[in-house]
């Protein structure tokens, strides 16, 4: 049923964006004729699936890139809080890396609900964001403006982790600011509130990040942990 809906949507999408019948393969993967598994790379920036996690990098997975910034040439230009152009239950997975913290807390809840909506019943979410518990430990010891680690964009301080990378926050890039934060407990709570039933999460204090795998319909603890081996880094 959703396949026919997706085919109609593809025609509207192609007309709106000037695409001909030789659609990009990523967009074609929204149709009912796509073979293989599909994951939505939310807030992708310039990254491709090779920059995600090993589980998504195999040929078994088709990547669909979504970003609000048209300059990064995503397959779909949209906000993660409104993905209404993506049919319900279409996708096998959603990957969200370091973008939920750019939303206010209420917006983050909306985004998580959207992630849940577009997933098939056996689909899952992989999400990562800063670990505020690890950052708070540095701040409590008066290291607010000292380098916590060095990223490809340069040195990162606890201040950058909390509020957004200051070297990038220049007009018109103010949307790069951070507006919410999570510990592992509060991230799990937010994901469950959005409708996900089972979660497997870890803290990586030395990397100052959280990783969470959430299944839409529910798996046994053992099955969830096996799945996490390919999609959650050590």
Q: Model-found features: residue ranges?
A:
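A structural signal for well-ordered alpha-helical scaffolds and beta->alpha junctions
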Residues: 23-24, 39, 183-184
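Conserved long hydrophobic alpha-helices within structured protein cores
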Residues: 31-45, 151-159
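Conserved SAM-binding loop
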Residues: 37-137, 212-216
């Amino acid at each position: 049923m959703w396949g026919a809906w997706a085919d109609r949507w593809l025609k509207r999408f192609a007309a709106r964006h000037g695409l001909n019948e030789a659609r990009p393969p990523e967009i074609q993967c929204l149709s009912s004729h796509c073979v293989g598994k599909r994951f939505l790379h939310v807030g992708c920036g310039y990254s491709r699936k090779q920059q995600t996690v090993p589980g998504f990098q195999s040929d078994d997975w088709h990547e669909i890139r979504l970003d609000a910034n048209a300059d990064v040439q995503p397959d779909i230009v949209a906000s993660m809080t409104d993905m209404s152009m993506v049919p319900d239950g279409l996708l096998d997975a959603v990957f969200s890396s370091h973008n939920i913290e750019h939303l206010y807390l209420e917006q983050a809840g909306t985004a998580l609900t959207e992630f849940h909506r577009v997933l098939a019943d056996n689909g899952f979410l992989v999400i990562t964001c800063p670990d505020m518990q690890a950052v708070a430990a540095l701040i409590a010891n008066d290291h607010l403006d000292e380098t916590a680690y060095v990223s490809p964009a340069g040195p990162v301080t606890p201040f950058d982790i909390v509020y957004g990378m200051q070297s990038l926050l220049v007009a018109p890039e103010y949307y790069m600011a951070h507006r919410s934060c999570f510990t592992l407990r509060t991230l799990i709570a937010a994901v469950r509130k959005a409708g996900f039933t089972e979660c497997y999460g870890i803290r990586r204090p030395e990397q100052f990040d959280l990783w969470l795998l959430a299944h839409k319909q529910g798996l046994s603890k053992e099955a969830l942990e096996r799945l996490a081996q390919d999609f959650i880094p050590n």
